[in-house]
Design a protein with these regions (language model features):
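N-terminal Rossmann-fold cofactor-binding loop
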Residues: 30-35, 51
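Conserved Rossmann-fold NAD(P)-dependent oxidoreductase catalytic core, especially the SDR/UDP-sugar
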Residues: 85-134, 153
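N-terminal Rossmann NAD(P)H-binding glycine-rich loop of SDR-like oxidoreductase domains
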Residues: 3-23
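Glycine/proline-rich active-site loop of Rossmann-fold NAD(P)-dependent oxidoreductases
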Residues: 162-175, 210-220
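Conserved beta-loop-beta element that borders a ligand/cofactor-binding pocket
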Residues: 115, 141-167
Length: 299
């Protein structure tokens, strides 16, 4: 298939782009910024695109068989001093379905929306959290566009852990530096609580599965391992050759309370549906391998 990946210069979309290319697909990535030259992502075809502005012409979109959308806005994308609720409305609630509608109208036949796990794993949070509500409405708006000629599904992922050759992901570089003692005198600790994690590799496999076999209009809650945050931080520390950090009930600079929408000290665990996991064809128990890969990249 000829596949357009919006957000393909980021970690999730970039990993999916390289995975899909390795599987024999013809891949073009789209985003606001071109990937660095001399990197694997820099070697892919690139379209400059701001999906919120819906600035790709029908002729450009219509050149593709399939769309993967991995550019949903989260807390990292709110303009400084901006109105968060208004941003979520414009970027997610309005912008994402509008872009999918343009893709459908241009003749793309298959689309996968990479969304957030929160609306399915903890739907109650959408009642009071404007960000989660925006991801829920974006997901529902995208899937409502399904027709016999436009097969669309969502792959809704938890916390994603991964690495892409040639791409610096500041969060994972910071985790690695922290585990190696590079943030001293900042104390070594992990916050209480835990969540489901998935590797970028597992997610890329799920995206491919949804492209090939996804049920029209379906939202798939994907996931891999339920880990405490101590387990998660501990994996980085062990690979760096240092002891697992203790749990301290205070906000962590590298995992702030704003990033734990279900509340520090709580857990958000679940087991993905076995039949859906088999249909999408993604691997499990991949987090420790992935953390080792991350630490090796940034060490």
């Amino acid at each position: 298939m000829k596949i357009l990946i919006v957000g393909g210069n980021g970690m999730i979309g970039g990993h999916a782009a390289l995975h899909l290319r390795s599987r024999g697909h013809e891949v073009t990535i789209a985003g606001r910024n071109r990937p660095a030259s001399g990197t694997p992502l820099g070697g892919l075809d690139f379209l400059r695109c701001d999906y919120i502005a819906n600035d790709l012409h029908a002729a450009q979109l219509g050149a593709f068989d399939a769309l993967v959308f991995a550019a949903g806005n989260d807390v990292r994308h709110v303009p400084p001093g901006g109105d968060e609720a208004a941003h979520w409305e414009r970027a997610n609630v309005e912008g994402v379905p509008r872009f999918f509608r343009a893709a459908r109208d241009a003749g793309i036949g298959v689309a996968v929306h990479v969304g957030s796990f929160y609306p399915q794993a903890a739907p109650r949070l959408a009642e009071d959290n404007a960000y989660i509500r925006s991801r829920k409405l974006a997901d529902e708006g995208v899937r409502a566009l399904a027709t016999d000629a436009f097969r669309v599904s969502s792959v809704n992922a938890p916390f994603v852990v991964g690495t892409v050759p040639g791409l610096i992901v500041p969060m994972f570089k910071a985790y690695t530096d922290y585990a190696r003692g590079g943030f001293a005198p900042m104390p070594d600790f992990a916050p209480p609580g835990g969540v489901n994690f998935i590797s970028a590799m597992s997610l890329s496999e799920a995206i491919e599965g949804a492209l090939l076999r996804g049920e029209n209009g379906k939202a798939y809650l994907v996931g891999d391992e339920n880990l405490t945050f101590q387990d998660y931080f501990g994996a980085f520390f062990r690979d760096a050759g240092r002891p697992v950090p203790p749990v301290i009930d205070q906000e962590h600079p590298l995992l702030p309370d704003s990033a734990i929408c279900f509340g520090r000290g709580n857990t958000l665990y679940y087991e993905p549906d076995a039949a859906e996991t088999a249909l999408l064809g993604y691997r499990r128990r991949d987090i420790l391998r992935t953390v080792s890969e991350i630490v090796a990249q940034y060490s």
